[in-house]
């Protein structure tokens, strides 16, 4: 059996490892990675704060790490759950023995924005420069899926990786022609009269954040996966119904002005899947697009990369007999 009380590894210097005290020294420890404890992870935050994790007999140990580090640690067997499902999917496409078991958000919260008046349509962007944060990130993938949806050759656009701190100067100066921007970004760009070419939230879906596990853990201890997902699903349903209490919980982990948290909450809410999973056609499109991006020639079937059976079971049971309460 997979040992849930795994040994604590020596993390890379950039990783902050800490325990969340869930109220019981007798609970089973599980280690979960998060790139940041923001509104995008409010399902997990509420699960911890409302005690749903503890109800399942679990104590969460939080590992703060980016998707790359988290996925490597997941593959090594030193991490139970990663919330960086997109990065884990790339690893799985390359043959890594991980599976995505839950998808919380599937609608990318980006608008493709240009501040060039002559650029009015997606077609006008052919041959133009599009600023992204990093190659293969959500903004990049969402833009690729958008172009594919409208039959545009993705090789006809010049994507330039510009780190966050340099993207706005590049956009404002006109050295790039467009960029996928979040609602928070657009609030800053607003006075600059940037205009929206497309809203990816309404146009495409992809596997954004959720939960990835090692294939070994899923095979050897599916009950542990079920307990964790049940707690997270409860946190998710509470968060969807009760905005103000949820924002207060998020603020404990990421102190941010309340108006910004409110915008983030609304943005995440609009991106959430209905019941923690996405359809096969969405999976096929993302597998193909992500595979092309990372140059995987032989693409596996969706069933080798995703297993939504547990989250579907959890949601079916919760809908019959459980409702969130303040």
Where are the regions that the model predicts?
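Bacterial N-terminal signal peptides
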Residues: 11-21
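Bacterial N-terminal signal peptides that target proteins for export
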Residues: 2-12
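Conserved C-terminal helix/tail region of periplasmic/extracytoplasmic solute-binding proteins
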Residues: 291-326
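Sec/Tat signal peptide C-region and signal peptidase I cleavage site
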Residues: 22-27
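Secondary-structure end/capping motifs
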Residues: 220-298
């Amino acid at each position: 059996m997979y040992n849930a009380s795994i040994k604590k590894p020596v993390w890379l210097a950039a990783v902050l490892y800490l325990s969340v005290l869930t109220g019981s020294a007798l609970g089973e420890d599980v280690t979960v990675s998060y790139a940041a404890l923001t509104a995008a992870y409010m399902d997990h935050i509420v699960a911890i704060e409302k005690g749903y994790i503890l109800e399942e007999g679990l104590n969460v140990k939080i590992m703060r790490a980016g998707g790359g580090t988290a996925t490597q640690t997941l593959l090594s067997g030193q991490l139970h759950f990663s919330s960086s499902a997109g990065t884990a999917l790339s690893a799985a496409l390359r043959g890594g023995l991980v599976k995505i078991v839950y998808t919380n958000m599937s609608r990318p919260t980006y608008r493709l924005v240009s501040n060039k008046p002559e650029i009015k349509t997606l077609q006008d962007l052919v041959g133009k420069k599009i600023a992204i944060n990093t190659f293969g990130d959500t903004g990049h993938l969402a833009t690729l899926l958008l172009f594919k949806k409208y039959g545009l050759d993705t090789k006809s656009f010049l994507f330039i990786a510009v780190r966050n701190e340099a993207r706005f100067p590049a956009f404002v100066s006109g050295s790039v022609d467009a960029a996928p921007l979040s609602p928070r970004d657009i609030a800053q760009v607003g006075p600059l009269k940037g205009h929206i070419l497309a809203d990816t939230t309404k146009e495409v879906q992809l596997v954004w954040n959720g939960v990835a596990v090692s294939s070994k853990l899923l095979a050897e201890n599916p009950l542990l996966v079920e307990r964790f997902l049940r707690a997270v699903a409860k946190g998710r349903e509470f968060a969807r119904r009760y905005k103000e209490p949820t924002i207060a919980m998020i603020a404990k982990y990421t102190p941010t002005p309340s108006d910004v948290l409110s915008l983030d909450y609304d943005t995440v809410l609009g991106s959430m899947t209905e019941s923690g999973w996405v359809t096969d056609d969405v999976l096929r499109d993302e597998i193909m697009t992500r595979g092309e991006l990372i140059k995987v020639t032989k693409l596996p079937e969706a069933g080798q990369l995703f297993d939504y059976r547990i989250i579907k079971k959890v949601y079916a049971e919760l809908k019959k007999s459980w409702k969130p309460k303040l």
